Curated annotation (Swiss-Prot):
InterPro entries: Aromatic_Lyase, Fumarase/histidase_N, HutH, L-Aspartase-like, Phe/His_NH3-lyase_AS. Keywords: Cytoplasm, Histidine metabolism, Lyase. One of its GO terms (molecular function) is histidine ammonia-lyase activity. This is Histidine ammonia-lyase. The modification 2,3-didehydroalanine (Ser) is found at S142. GO terms for biological process: L-histidine catabolic process to glutamate and formamide; L-histidine catabolic process to glutamate and formate. The gene is hutH. Pathway: Amino-acid degradation; L-histidine degradation into L-glutamate; N-formimidoyl-L-glutamate from L-histidine: step 1/3. CDD domains: PAL-HAL. There is a cross-link at A141-G143 (5-imidazolinone (Ala-Gly)). Its EC number is 4.3.1.3. Pfam families: Lyase_aromatic (PF00221).
Length: 505
C-alpha cells in the first residue's frame, strides 16, 4: 500500500501502482488539509463572493455570475459538456494513473474539494475500477479538460469503466462494489478536470516503458556486437570518462559487463582498425538517450506532485488565485524530447540490422539466409524496421510548437502536451519492434559464429529468445516472430522493473 501525500509520489511507486496493481491510501495530515480547504469554498458560496469556477461560469463565461441554488448544477453541467473525448481509449494503466495523480494533487489541500471526492478516487484505484477515457480531444490547456471529464463522469455513475476485464457502464461496477455515485458540489467539477493528469499519466507509462526498452537495447546491441565481431576497445572506460557524460560512461560500463567473457569480440587491429559508428558509438548515442530519460523523469516527478487546477486556495482562504498551472507546456516539452530520444534508439538499431544482413558489410550469409537466393531470410525484416524508423520521424515532430486558440480566444495559447505524450508512447512501441528485428538477426548471427562463444549474459539472453522464436532454417512468416519477441520484451523483460543485465543469467 502506497501512501499519497500530494508531495512525495515517485516514478518507482508509480511502477508498482500501474503495473503491479498496488493499492493506495491517503496521508491523514494531507486529508486534514483537504477538509480545511473545503471549508473555505463553502464559506465563499455562503457569502456569495464572486470567485472564478465557484460562483461564475468557465472560460469565456467567467464573467457570468452563478446563483447559489445553481452551484451544483454548474458543476454537473461542466462535466457533461466537457466530456468530448474521441477515439480509442487510453490504455487501462493510463486511466488508473489519472485517478492516482488526480487524487494526489487534491491532497495538496489547495483545490477545495471535499475529502469524499478524494476517497472516491482512491476507492476506484483500490477496487480496480478504471475509467474508459478517449485518447483524443485535449489541447493540454486548460489542462486535459476532455479526458478528465470522462474520468469525472464515472464518479457520478455515468460513462464507462474497465472492470474485471470488461468494458461496462460505470453503474454496473459501482453496484457490484457497493459504492454510491457522488453528487458534485461547488468547485469540485472544475477541480477534477482542470489539470494535466492525462498527459502526465500517459507520460509516466511511456517513461517506464522507455526505461526498460533502453536497457533491453543495450543487451540486444551487445548481441549484435558479437555477431559482427565488434571491437571491444571502443568501450574502454578511459574513452568515455574523458567525455564527461555519466550516462555515456554507464552505458559503456554495462556493455563491458555484458560482454566481459565473450569470445566473439575482437581487439582493434585484429580484424579491422575501427568499427562503423552504429557499433563504435553505442555509448555516445544510447547514453544521450539516457540523458533525455533522466530529464523526462525529473519533470514527470515534479508534475506528479503539482497542483495543476484553477483557482487555487491559499492561507486559509485569504488568497483564492486564478493562475495557469493547468498549462501543460513543461510536460509537452518533456514528451517531445522523449520522442526524439527514443526514436534515435530505433535509428541506430536499424543501422545495426543493416550491418547484420548486408553481405557487403560482414562475412555472414547474405540476409542471414539458410539458402541465399532460394530463401530471402531476414531481407524484408530490415524493410519493416526501416518503415518503423521512418514512421517515428513523423511522430517525433514536436507537438508543443503548435497552438490553436480556444474558448473565444480566452484560452489563446495551449500546449498540445497530450498529443506529445500519446505520440511518445507510439514511438516506444515502434522502437520495441525495431529492437525485436535486431534481436532476431543477432540470434541468427550468433548461431553462425558459435553460441558457445557468446558471453554468459548474451548466451542466456539468446536461449530465452529462442524459446520465443525458432532458428531460421527456412523462410516463414516472420511477422509472427517479430510480434512474439516484441510481446516477450514488453511482458517478460519487463516494464515492471529496471533491467539488470544479471537478470539474464
Amino acid at each position: 500500500m502506497i501512501t499519497l501525500t500530494g508531495h512525495t509520489l515517485t516514478i518507482e511507486e508509480m511502477k508498482r501502482l500501474l503495473l503491479e496493481g498496488e493499492g493506495v491510501t491517503a496521508c491523514p495530515n494531507s486529508m486534514q488539509k483537504v477538509a480545511e480547504c473545503r471549508e473555505v469554498v463553502e464559506k465563499i458560496v455562503e457569502d456569495g463572493k464572486v470567485v472564478y469556477g465557484i460562483t461564475t461560469g468557465f472560460g469565456k463565461f467567467s464573467d457570468v455570475l452563478i446563483q447559489k441554488d445553481d452551484v451544483k448544477a454548474l458543476q454537473h453541467n461542466l462535466i457533461q459538456s466537457h466530456a468530448c473525448g474521441i477515439g480509442d481509449p487510453f490504455p487501462e494503466e493510463v486511466s488508473r494513473g489519472m485517478l492516482i495523480l488526480r487524487a494526489n494533487t487534491m491532497l495538496k489541500g489547495v483545490s477545495g474539494v471535499r475529502p469524499l471526492v478524494v476517497n472516491m478516487l482512491l476507492e476506484f484505484v483500490n477496487r480496480k475500477i478504471h475509467p474508459v477515457v478517449p485518447q483524443q480531444g485535449s489541447l493540454g490547456a486548460s489542462g486535459d479538460l476532455a479526458p478528465l471529464s470522462h474520468l469525472a463522469l464515472v464518479l457520478l455513475g455515468e460513462g464507462e469503466v474497465f472492470y474485471k476485464g470488461k468494458r461496462v457502464h460505470a453503474m454496473v461496477a459501482l453496484t457490484e462494489e457497493g459504492l454510491e455515485p457522488i453528487e458534485l458540489e461547488a468547485k469540485e467539477g472544475l477541480a477534477l478536470i482542470n489539470g494535466t493528469q492525462a498527459m502526465t499519466a500517459q507520460g509516466v507509462l511511456s517513461y517506464i516503458e522507455a526505461e526498460a526498452t533502453s536497457y533491453q537495447a543495450e543487451l540486444i546491441a551487445s548481441m549484435t556486437i558479437e555477431g559482427l565481431q565488434g571491437i571491444i576497445d571502443a568501450f574502454d572506460e578511459n574513452v568515455h570518462k574523458t567525455r564527461g557524460y555519466k550516462e555515456q560512461v554507464e552505458v559503456a560500463s554495462r556493455i563491458r559487463d555484458i560482454l566481459h567473457d565473450s569470445k566473439l569480440t575482437t581487439k582493434q587491429g585484429e580484424l579491422r582498425v575501427q568499427d562503423a559508428y552504429s557499433l563504435r558509438c553505442i555509448p555516445q548515442v544510447h547514453g544521450a538517450s539516457w540523458q533525455v530519460l533522466n530529464y523526462v523523469k525529473e519533470k514527470l516527478e515534479i508534475e506528479m506532485n503539482a497542483a495543476t487546477d484553477n483557482p487555487l486556495i491559499f492561507d486559509g482562504g485569504e488568497k483564492v488565485i486564478s493562475g495557469g498551472n493547468f498549462h501543460g507546456q513543461p510536460i509537452a516539452f518533456a514528451m517531445d524530447f522523449l520522442k526524439v530520444g527514443m526514436a534515435e534508439l530505433a535509428n541506430i538499431s536499424e543501422r545495426r540490422i543493416e550491418r547484420l544482413v548486408n553481405p557487403q558489410l560482414n562475412d555472414l550469409p547474405p540476409f542471414l539466409s539458410p539458402e541465399p537466393g532460394l530463401q530471402s531470410g531476414a531481407m524484408i525484416m530490415q524493410y519493416a524496421a526501416a518503415s518503423l524508423v521512418s514512421e517515428n520521424k513523423t511522430l517525433a515532430h514536436p507537438a508543443s510548437v503548435d497552438s490553436i486558440p480556444s474558448s473565444a480566444n480566452q484560452e489563446d495559447h495551449v500546449s498540445m502536451g497530450t498529443i506529445a505524450s500519446r505520440h511518445a508512447h507510439q514511438i516506444i512501441q515502434n522502437v520495441r519492434r525495431v529492437l525485436s528485428v535486431e534481436m532476431i538477426c543477432a540470434m541468427q548471427a550468433a548461431e553462425y559464429r558459435g553460441i558457445e562463444n557468446m558471453s554468459t549474459v548474451t548466451k542466456s539472453f539468446y536461449h530465452q529468445g529462442r524459446q520465443q522464436v525458432p532458428s531460421i532454417t527456412n523462410d516463414r512468416i516472420f511477422s509472427t516472430d517479430i510480434e512474439n519477441i516484441t510481446h516477450w520484451l514488453k511482458t517478460n523483460y519487463s516494464i515492471k522493473e529496471r533491467l539488470d543485465v544479471n537478470a539474464a543469467l
